[in-house]
Structures are given as C-alpha cells and as structure tokens.
Design a protein with these regions (language model features):
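Metal- or metallocofactor-binding catalytic centers and their adjacent structured scaffolds
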Residues: 2-87
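Generic secondary-structure signature for well-ordered alpha-helical cores
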Residues: 4, 29, 33, 37, ...
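Conserved, mostly hydrophobic/aromatic
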Residues: 6, 76, 89, 142, ...
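Flexible, glycine/charged-enriched surface loops at secondary-structure junctions
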Residues: 40, 95, 145, 198-202, ...
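Generic detector of well-ordered alpha-helical packing
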Residues: 78, 83, 144-146, 175-176, ...
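Metal-dependent enolase-superfamily TIM-barrel catalytic cores that perform enediolate-based chemistry
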Residues: 98-218
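Shared catalytic-loop signature of beta/alpha-barrel
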Residues: 189, 206-317
C-alpha cells in the first residue's frame, strides 16, 4: 500500500494473440502463490524484484520451445514492472533509465501508426481514408499490409499511399511472414524504387536463411523480430539472418518474449554484437514498450490508433 491505498500492477499480452488464461491460472500464477516472500522481494526489502519473480515463474521450465508460455510470462512480467514503478513513485521509463540504463531518458519518442489491413470490400479509397486519419492525428510515418493481394494490386496500393504520405521514408510495409524466398525477392525488387522506410517480416521469422538471402538482393531497410520470443532466437537472427546493423530494424516485443527481464538480456546481447539499441522499434503498440523506448534509448514504438481497443487507444490524449 501507498498512503493507505492498494497498489495494483496491470499487465496484458500483445496484439493479435490468443489468450493465455489457462497457462496463467494453472501453471504460472500458482508458482507465485506458493513462493516465499524472500523469493519475490528485492534484497533491500523495499520493493518487488522482477528478476526474482521471473526466476520463480520459470522454475522447472525446459529451455527452448518459446511458444505461448513466453506470452504468459510476459503478461505477468508487465504487471510486475508496473507495480514496481508505482511503488517507487516514478514513471517506469525514469526507473529503467536510472537502474538499467545510463540515467538518461526522454519524454518524447518516435512513434508510427500501424494498420492498413485487408478487409472484404476494403478498396484503395478506404485504405487512403484510414491512412489520412493517422496523418490527421499527427503521425508522419504509417504502416500497411502487403501480400494479401496479387503483387500488381499491392503495388497500386503502395503507390496510392505514397502519394498521400509524400515520401517512401514515411511508409513501412508488412508481409506478416507470408512469403517464400522467391516471392519475398520478387516483392523486394518491385518495391526497391520506392525507398520505403522498411520491408517487414517477408518470410517465416525463424527462416534465417530466407532473410539473409533477401538482404543480399534488397538494398533498402528490412525489419523483423516481433515473432522471436527469446534472447536466443533474437541472437540467431543477428548471427544468421543477414540483418545489417546500419540500416535494418529489430522489432522484438517484450510482452511476447518473456517480458522485460528477458528483454534486458536481449538488449545486452545486441550490445555484444555491436548493435545499437536505437535500431529497435518494438512491435505491439503497448505502454510497456513505450516506456522501454523512452528509458532505454530504443528507436521508437509502434501504435495502432484505430485497432485492438482499448489497448490501441493510449495515444488518444
């Protein structure tokens, strides 16, 4: 309690996922309930310890197999960090900067508006209306989906949005991992003249060879990583995926990948491979990533202004 009031930490997992309620109720929350206080509290006895709680959650878990459990742990982890910062009575981004960063934080980060999904009957004018609504909110960079229509039609969609946003650096495209290598390269060759901000998740996120081959033929920025759920998978992307530290973007989502405790390990790994944290723009559009970006010098954050409510609504104010 603070000043007699109960303090509650809130956590939720990322967009576009099935709920992990059963994993939470039957596997992870019971471990917390059964843990001794010393295994949950920091050594000073002044606050909860995210690292200790994470260790309790992961006890007896085998390595590898980073699937739905990573999201369940990430959901609890988010609530823990929210609780910790409230007990400290400082914004989470400030707490992260002071404890895990260089003490420097910012109140302003780069944010882009994601959307541009395919829907039955959604034509190019409707796509443009959606993108214009994001520009009207003050966003300068937007993202749209590709791969759900034939290449020729997708190119028309892209060119229409480019006329609206004015420059390729203001537009990202996302294939959601749907392409094989031939299609990924074909799209890349067709889109290269547009000089887009990035070409996202062309193929399966674990197909590092595909990503590496694409990087040899597509000279503009690539982006991927939202569906890599551990430090080890993220490291394999950097080792084998052909990602270029000067131009490409990493999109690891802390909520999907065991939470911020694991994310800190991923950021440390990146530093060991001479990757700047500014090359990370997390997937998901949730407030934890926003605080991480502001407190640990990431490159920005994703937001879904009109989707995934209520969680997509936090930029409203």
């Amino acid at each position: 309690k603070i000043n007699g009031e109960n303090v509650v930490g809130y956590g939720f997992h990322s967009n576009g996922r099935y709920a992990v309620s059963e994993l939470l109720k039957k596997r992870f929350i019971p471990r917390l309930n059964e843990a001794e206080e010393k295994d949950l509290i920091n050594d000073e006895g002044t606050n909860f310890s995210p690292e200790k709680i994470w260790k309790v959650l992961m006890q007896n878990e085998k390595p590898g197999g980073h699937g739905e459990r990573s999201t369940a742990v990430g959901t609890i982890d988010m609530a823990v960090w929210d609780l910790v910062s409230k007990i400290e009575q400082v914004p989470l981004y400030e707490y992260l900067a002071n404890k895990y960063g260089n003490g420097k934080f910012t109140n302003k980060i780069f944010v882009y508006a994601a959307g541009g999904y395919y829907y039955p009957g959604k034509d190019i004018p409707m796509l443009l209306d959606e993108m214009k609504s994001y520009l009207d909110l003050g966003f300068t960079t937007v993202k749209m989906k590709i791969g759900g229509a034939p290449l020729k039609e997708d190119l028309k969609r892209i060119e229409s949005v480019l006329k609206l946003v004015g420059d390729g650096n203001n537009l990202c495209v996302d294939a959601n991992g749907r392409f094989d290598i031939e299609t990924a390269i074909e799209y890349g060759q067709a889109m290269e003249p547009y000089n887009l901000k990035w070409y996202e998740e062309a193929g399966d996120p674990l197909d590092y060879e595909l990503n590496s081959e694409l990087s040899k033929s597509y000279k503009n920025p690539l982006a991927t990583g939202e569906n890599l759920f551990s430090m080890q998978d993220s490291r394999n992307l950097i080792r084998y995926g052909g990602m270029r530290k000067e131009t490409d973007w990493l999109q690891f989502d802390c909520s999907l990948s065991y939470g911020l405790v694991e994310y800190l390990k991923t950021l440390k790994m990146m530093d060991e491979y001479n990757w700047s944290s500014t090359r990370v723009i997390p997937h998901g559009g949730h407030q934890l990533s926003c605080n991480i970006a502001a407190g640990l010098n990431l490159g920005g954050n994703e937001i879904y202004p009109s989707l995934f409510q209520p969680f997509g609504g936090f930029p409203d104010s």
